[in-house]
């Protein structure tokens, strides 16, 4: 019988275990494909002390138990040698048929991971605490906003979920609630009051320069459309006979300055929005003022867009966001009582809140807003306060 191999403390070493000249322990094993791998530790057993000046790590035999469990469950060795960046790239490659805006968001995450040390980390080395600390560092040290971090994790988390499903790793280190780790510093896009809306619209209507955008902004406040939906409207989408707006697409301009027609944001986004007489009058004015370009722009087979820029191209969200910004800036320089930040999306919030205050049936409001989930209608877009609650209680009691 061959003599048992022992370490420097005279302990019997198991098959595959050796102690190196520098005192470290090494374990050699074969993965399910027959390829050799090695793991190291300064400790043989969990009760051993870590040598002074050495990084604390799992003992060799603790690592062996993990390896045996992974081999039994067909978990790939070393996470298949994927880095975080490589895993995310593989995940994105599986996401075919996504919108251009979504694809652009994916590319932003890839570009970020190419520069960040996390992108070079091997996926099996990323633990829950590493994932948490990384996100905290992004906010505290790199100044990333909650929204930006939410977008990054929104790609990394499902990529790691795919790795679990592919038996590359055992657990998803990003499977936790983001709000429990970093501070949500997102600025809530509040609806403005009816009085603020009135002052804002009156200022636009009477301003020699910005009055050209009055009808469009009035429509945004009175229909709750998404700005991309409004920009995508063509003459054919305005049904004067049935007094409704047919919303069945949105207009997007990509980072490459390409104009793209996409389906509405959600399945419920395709809808018909009733027109009030005031909204109908605004559309008629827009069409009356619309000059016929030398070459009618065509995007995705559609033409007849309501608003065109100075180059004869359809106006997009960025145009309107800038108009809103300049209007509020001019208003606040003119009047002592300033207006808060108002954007096209604030118009959407405001419309929803006004309809809720007016007692519109929640399901009807959900349909008009194009929300797939009524909780979005009720919880995200309705900004009701104590005064509204008080008025409702008084109304019920009076009845």
Label each region the model flagged:
Residues 1-22:
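Short N-terminal "domain-start" leader segments
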Residues 16, 202-211, 223, 273, ...:
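Short, basic (Lys/Arg/His-rich) helix/loop patches that form interaction surfaces
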Residues 20-125, 129, 288-302:
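N-terminal DNA-binding module of tyrosine recombinases/phage integrases
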Residues 52, 56, 80, 92-168, ...:
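N-terminal core-binding DNA-recognition domain of tyrosine site-specific recombinases/integrases
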Residues 150-154, 165, 169-233, 241, ...:
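Basic, Lys/Arg- and aromatic-enriched nucleic-acid-binding interface segment
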Residues 233-291, 298:
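Conserved tyrosine-mediated DNA breakage-rejoining catalytic core shared by Y-recombinases
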Residues 242-247, 343, 354, 366-384, ...:
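Short functional hotspots where side chains directly engage DNA or cofactors
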Residues 256-261, 358, 379, 383-399:
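DNA/chromatin major-groove-contacting recognition/catalytic segments
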